[in-house]
Swiss-Prot record:
Short name of any one Pfam family annotated for the protein: RuvB_N
SMART domains: AAA
Organism listed in the record: Synechococcus sp. (strain WH7803)
Compositional bias (Basic and acidic residues): 13-23, 31-48
UniProt keyword list: ATP-binding, Cytoplasm, DNA damage, DNA recombination, DNA repair, DNA-binding, Hydrolase, Nucleotide-binding
Binding locations of Mg(2+): T95
Full protein name: Holliday junction branch migration complex subunit RuvB
A single GO BP: DNA recombination
Amino acid sequence: MAIVSSNAASQRPRPDRGPDRVPNRVVDGARQAEDDRDPGRVGAKEDSLRPKRLADYIGQRELKQVLGIAVQAAVGRGEALDHVLLYGPPGLGKTTMAMVLAEELGVTCRITSAPALERPRDIVGLLVTLQPKDLLFIDEIHRLSRVAEELLYPAMEDRRLDLTVGKGSTARTRALDLPPFTLVGATTRAGALSSPLRDRFGLIQRLEFYGLEDLQAIVERAAGLLDLDLSAAACTEIARRCRGTPRIANRLLRRVRDVACVRACAGRIDQALVDEALTLHRVDGRGLDASDRRLMELLLQSHGGGPAGLDTLAAALGEDPATLESVVEPYLLQLGFLQRTPRGRVVTAAGRGHLGWPYPQEQAA
């Protein structure tokens, strides 16, 4: 139960109120299509790369199957979709999936993030303006404050807001009924969610890194939407270097487009041009960037390959430990170039080989 001011409790927030408006984005199917037709609108190109329907969403087959069944069942019963928690590394399509679900359900998707919901009236303002069956997407949901979480408990379970109006002896409890809605939460740290919040999600699904075949299809689709003529080898090269992440694939594709534009490349973009563009941005053949190599080289040069503690490495690199752990390390771990041990981080034999660093026995010799 949360304490809010009597003014906030007695008035239903209006979407057009300036100071009290909660920072969020409303995505509507018809408006989305209009934005895509007008490339002059902010975000038109960015949104145009996002798939709109489950059939267009490439990869994550098991996730699509589970959510597809849930959507069909909810539509068939005329109910709101059960609450969904999506977790996994950044850039794998959690926000896109929320927008796809809203499109499949034919409802409005309200997009916000946990850091934007600092005050109780922020989350209250969002919840009381939801229409029946609307989808509310909260990114970085693990960063919700305790008060915001407590407001969500009855809202998710009983479609009710429990508010305490006033203070001291004049305090009274007021319950506001909410329409049926779907909360879709996204997080890169599922373990950081409190158990009461996590247990209120009916569907908890993990997004996995993408395979090469799916990434090739994603790059081909994005190239078509950006009016780029990519050779098959060029497409494969981008897919190999994007760290199994569609967001990075689209970013690298745009950097290739920049180089092609400057080079006045009027024909098909080939593998050589892709290699030139990505080498310029210090992305090597396995997708490692400058941050990855700095971490591994620090371990090798200053710590003999490890082990070394995360805080020690972060201080030496001038990085935040959380950034190293959540952004840099996952892909190195996936490739088998890095190991996490109780004593710290260690560069593996595969990591040494990739950097051309001699093995310990060679150094001793």
